[in-house]
Amino acid sequence: MKKIFLIPAILFLSFATAGATEQDTVNRCAAIIHDFRRMPERAIPRDVLRHARGLAIISVFKAGFIFTGKGGHGVVVARTRHGWSGPSFIATGGAGWGLQAGAQVTDYVIVLNNNGAVRAFSRGGNVTIGADVSAAAGPLGRTAKGAVAPTAAVYTYSKSKGLFAGVSLEGAVIGTQRDSNFRYYGRPVRADEILSAIAPPPPGAAPLRRALSR
């Protein structure tokens, strides 16, 4: 029975990401950053972004009825001496039980507040939020407390149906997409090479880097 209900969710998630290229993912992440910057009084405080050592940006598709499936793709970037790094591709996914029908898309921004958080994503494996890096729901608004003196290695934010929120992502597992990095950079490249800017950002990363630098 569980497999019967899970199949529609898996099919939806497959169709939702089918045909999406790495450049599509980068463009989507640039649009997410624009959205989060557009209403600073309701979204991520400017000081949080100004002091960030890196950002993980991901869109998660969730669908199903009774049994739900979810999956998401995105990128992580780091601040270097020469500006923002190129994107290293990441993904998350899973299945669970819930009284939910239909489909939902939620955009997440994970602010990497220190170099330790950047190193966790640079290892090129899986990062478990709350275990590999301490996490807290991020402060919201222009005058939010914690904007200058972070209380956790990462702050987590979400936007769904136009509503911004600081959210808990405790237990979420995010993994490096080595195949996507290979396709985007045209050669085998490690996450640490990307996030340290040893691997130069491809021209297609320019819109995302501009969005981050505003």
Which ranges hold each PLM region?
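Positively charged n-region of N-terminal signal peptides that target proteins for export
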Residues: 1-4
